[in-house]
Each structure stands twice: as structure tokens, then as C-alpha cells.
Amino acid sequence: MGKGKPRGLNAARKLSNHRREQRWADLHYKKRLLGTAFKSSPFGGASHAKGIVLEKVGVEAKQPNSAIRKCVKVQLIKNGKKVTAFVPNDGCLNFIDENDEVLLAGFGRKGKAKGDIPGVRFKVVKVSGVGLLALWKEKKEKPRS
């Protein structure tokens, strides 16, 4: 039989020390304490970020799907990092031009890519201060500049 955990009147220090050491095996705990979200993620811990469109790109979907997902390469204003962002809805890529200012949000789960789009962790929400969904539904027009 294994030894198991210490059980005794004077075992509290041993138990709490062991728990403290074992917590570092938990990914979420480690990320929170080391501040990884602020250091490594392009958004720096924020939910949204603005950027300038560098180019339009088509990203091939992963197997077993066969499609070219419409995306844009964006340089973030806050730190100059370059990211790829997904453009949702059919024909929305036509509303986005190079050098436009776009607002990006997270896409997928906990900073990972979503579905069959490899390496794309963000999606476009606004173009030139106008919501992409409003443009798509023809409720608003993109401002001329």
C-alpha cells in the first residue's frame, strides 16, 4: 500500500506546502501568476484591439474540409505586432480595403484557433468605426475618406 498524504495534528504545513507546489502543474494557475496573457498575447490581456490592414489573405481550411477562409493580415496599433484575423460572413471581405482601421476581437476558445482555420485567433468586428455586421446587412455605409 502507498503512503498517501500525511494525516496528523501537525501535518498542516506539510499539506499546504505540497498543495502550493502542485498548483504549478495547473496551466490556468501558472498563466495567471506568471502574467503570460500580458507578456505573450498580441492583445496584451485586452478583449479588443485596433489595427491597420496590411493585406487580404486566403487561409486554407484544415482536413477534412476544403475551403479558402477569407482573412486579413493586420498590424496592431498598440504594439506593432502582426496578426491574422478572420473576416466573418459571405462577401464581407469586399468592405475591407488595405490601410483601413479595423477593430479585432478574440475568435475561438481561450486564445486558441477556432474550427478548421489554422493559426487564426482573431476576427474583424468593425471597419473604419462601423460594425461589419451593419455593413453586411446594409444598415450602414462605410465612411468615405
Swiss-Prot record:
Keywords recorded for this protein, A-Z: Hydroxylation, Ribonucleoprotein, Ribosomal protein
InterPro entries the UniProt entry points to: NA-bd_OB-fold, Ribosomal_uS12, Ribosomal_uS12_euk/arc
Pfam assignment, any one: Ribosom_S12_S23
Protein family (similarity comment): Belongs to the universal ribosomal protein uS12 family.
Gene expressing this chain: rps23
GO MF annotation list: structural constituent of ribosome
GO CC, alphabetical: cytosolic small ribosomal subunit; ribosome
Matching CDD domains: Ribosomal_S23
Identification of the protein by name: Small ribosomal subunit protein uS12
GO terms of biological process kind: translation
Location of Hydroxyproline modifications: 64
